[in-house]
Amino acid sequence: MVKSKVSVIVPIYKVDGFIERCVVSLMEQTLDEVEYIFVDDASPDGSVNILREVVERYPSRKDCVKIITHSENKGLPAARNTGLAEATGEYIFHCDSDDFVELDMLESLYNKAKECDADVVWCDFFLSFETNERYMKQPSYSTPNDALKAMLSGAMKYNVWNKLVKRSLYIDNNISFPA
């Protein structure tokens, strides 16, 4: 089996109104060799059924999808950790299940990471609400120290869902989410 370029981790809990758009945007990515890990955090609604229905529409991606089920709700950090433990890709991308992404997002981030030999790359994003949407431009930095300072000072948003992170960074530094 070919090693995945990117493992996408998607926690699922009470998102039946959003999950279809999220999964479609992931299944239609232009990047090949993507592993999709969906973690059902004991969601009591129909989110996982919707997920399965959408995955069926994409037979070429179906074998790249893992659905892991928690027997009880453990919370978002635990769901992310479950996904990390299963991930095999060179890079990790976290996607919240109420998000949707541009169709070339993973390819753009992956190509930039490879071009720069980067451990972490990030992108701008939109915050979408029922009545409006805001474009959130993220600053660019040329050194790791500058990026870290910006993250710690709040100049750059610290969300995980707009960043592609080398999996070895998690493994080598024993990084997990506080659960």
Task: List each model region and its residues.
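Short aromatic/hydrophobic "clamp" motif used to bind/position activated sugar donors
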Residues: I92
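N-proximal low-complexity "stem/linker" segments adjacent to membrane-targeting elements
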Residues: M1-E28
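Conserved nucleotide-sugar donor-binding catalytic segment
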Residues: K149-A179
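Conserved donor NDP-sugar-binding/catalytic core segment of glycosyltransferases
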Residues: D104-Y135
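Acidic donor-binding segment of Leloir-type glycosyltransferases
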Residues: V23-T69, K114
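The conserved acidic donor/metal-binding loop of glycosyltransferases
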Residues: D96-F100, D119
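Short, flexible, basic/aromatic active-site loop/helix in glycosyltransferases
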Residues: D124, M136-A155
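Glycine-rich, basic loop-to-helix element that forms the pyrophosphate-binding segment
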Residues: T69-A87, S108
